[in-house]
Amino acid sequence: MELREEAWSPGPLDSEDQQMASHENPVDILIMDDDDVPSWPPTKLSPPQSAPPPGPPPRPRPPAPYICTECGKSFSHWSKLTRHQRTHTGERPNACTDCGKTFSQSSHLVQHRRIHTGEKPYACSECGKRFSWSSNLMQHQRIHTGEKPYTCPDCGRSFTQSKSLAKHRRSHSGLKPFVCPRCGRGFSQPKSLARHLRLHPELSGPGVAAKVLAASVRRAKAPEEATAADGEIAIPVGDGEGIIVVGPPGDGAAAAAALAGVGTRATGTRSRRAPAPKPYVCMECGKGFGHGAGLLAHQRAQHGDGLGVAVGEEPAHICVECGEGFVQGAALRRHKKIHAVGAPSVCSSCGQSFYRAGGEDDGEDQSAGARCAECRGGEAR
């Protein structure tokens, strides 16, 4: 049998062989795109996102069938309308049984009664100090938190109380709303005017000074209610009782006569009883009181006591000479004058208090008592 050697020739390729033959490098068939690689194990398909279920429909506002005939404001209850109408009529049916002060709402009377009862239901969680009103507690808590929400738009300085910001802004505006009716000099603070009134003898009396200071404070708060004509200074006195007319600055006689009650013109047709005198004036805010006890209670509640120490408040300013503590820096500065010039002495002749100059008491007979310079000068003459 004869064997023939035949040359090999490639035959027809199947689909898999054709795929391998189409690549230059057979390894390329093992490299697949990331999109073609199936994930394993297969992930579970999440259901299509659906919109959240709608919430309950908003509750309709109750009807407000009670309408105020003065301003058109509507209310849902008759009691609310009645309470609102008192703002137009001025009715104050709720009277305090202790002092007779009246209020338009019973809730205001409840708050006022705490002045007489001494009730302090609001306590600070940090230091335990108690207050009669929640607003005072909120202001006190800013001491612990350091919050100062009232910021000056001119310099950026912040304050814990709005009244402190209003007092500070006068330094930028140069406004001096507290005017002396004797000489026309203006002051930015009522206590500065109170000190200035001592320079005018006709205005330094207790009753007259209190009237001038209180009228100046009211005029500064509501300047549109006061009128000025022909160079006169018109100062309102009381609630619509009249206007004290003081002549141009420098007219001391007219000022004294007007402040004494001479030359006042009434603005109302109905005569009213003259207000009780308030000779005790607070040097911090200008508020007047009929009794010294009322002034003392006011100073302790609003400005601290006479030495600047508030009840239950930790003093932050300590005197290095004697160790006495003060809450306010101004009180400490006033106290340091005692160490600088000594304690005030009382004149044995006229009873006035005065400070001795350095070395003044060396040549004076202590047994005869201390005397002021005016009394000693009168004897010399």
Swiss-Prot record:
There is a cross-link at K191, K211 (Glycyl lysine isopeptide (Lys-Gly) (interchain with G-Cter in SUMO2)). SUPFAM superfamilies: beta-beta-alpha zinc fingers. Keywords: DNA-binding, Isopeptide bond, Metal-binding, Nucleus, Phosphoprotein, Repeat, Transcription, Transcription regulation, Ubl conjugation, Zinc, Zinc-finger. The keyword Nuclease does not apply. SMART domains: ZnF_C2H2. The modification Phosphothreonine is found at T117. It is found in: Nucleus. One of its GO terms (cellular component) is nucleus. GO terms for molecular function: sequence-specific double-stranded DNA binding; zinc ion binding. Residues 39-65 have a biased composition (Pro residues). May be involved in transcriptional regulation. This is Zinc finger protein 787. The gene is Znf787.
